[in-house]
Amino acid sequence: MSLSADVMAATKFSEEQLAKYVIDATKEVFSTMVMMDPADEYPLQEAVNRFKCSITGMVGFAGIYSGVISIHCPVNLAMKITSNMLGLECDEVNEDLNDAIGEISNMLGGSVKQVLSKGGLDVKLSIPTVIAGEDYTVNSLSDSDCVVIPFKIDDDKFLVGLVLKKED
């Protein structure tokens, strides 16, 4: 999975530069809001689109760019993230967990929006969408314009993905 030449030309960023922005945004959100320090393991060695016992938070982009930023993590890690973020114990998939993962995806979307758009005025964000399940697949219709960054916190791994398209 990588970004096409068209997307890189439109954004004026290389894939590595966009990946660095996503990595920096993820580390910033996690250090300030979750009090966790994720280590990136970029680049992703093998494409992942099937998730088991996981939760996915997504925010869409619309405007001069369209696309999605997403975070995919195992439920056990999502419960730790939620507990740290909200300062309360979370031991099941519930509204608090969905809200926390949705808010993290929203903050990541806001960070990327600022990079892609001068002042963020020509790119809008959707409301976060959260999916959780025992076994599900997430597919993009534009895998050729996708950057996925693996992260690790202790022994837990999660992914942050950015799918991007320049609108005409």
Report each predicted region and the residues it spans.
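N-terminal auxiliary interaction/assembly segments of multi-subunit proteins
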Residues: 1-168
